[in-house]
């Protein structure tokens, strides 16, 4: 799987489990809603620093954003 898509899917899955809208997550993370949207659609190529910052804003470890979701069997 493409790493951009994987990170985007994981961000969306975790964000939704936390009950956060893209707008609220943007406020918490410091990234724009447009960036979050593009990221979740697999159109952004986040740096490792960005992955750490997104993970911190979601309250998870950075590895949670780069590993396939076991529930999806990916």
What is the predicted role of each segment?
Residues 43-56, 72:
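Short, basic-rich loop-to-helix N-cap that marks the start of a DNA-contacting helix
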Residues 22, 33, 43-44, 62:
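The DNA-contacting recognition helix of HTH DNA-binding domains
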Residues 2, 56, 64-74:
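Short, charged recognition helix plus adjacent turn
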Residues 1-17:
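A short, Lys/Arg-rich alpha-helix, primarily the initiator
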Residues 16, 27, 56:
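Alpha-helical residues within the helix-turn-helix
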Residues 20-38:
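Short alpha-helical DNA-recognition segment
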């Amino acid at each position: 799987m493409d790493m951009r898509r994987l990170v985007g899917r994981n961000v969306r899955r975790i964000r939704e489990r936390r009950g956060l809208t893209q707008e609220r997550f943007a406020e918490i993370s410091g990234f724009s809603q447009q960036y979050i949207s593009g990221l979740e659609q697999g159109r952004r190529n986040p740096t490792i620093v960005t992955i750490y910052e997104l993970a911190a804003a979601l309250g998870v470890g950075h590895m949670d954003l780069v590993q396939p979701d076991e529930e999806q069997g990916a």
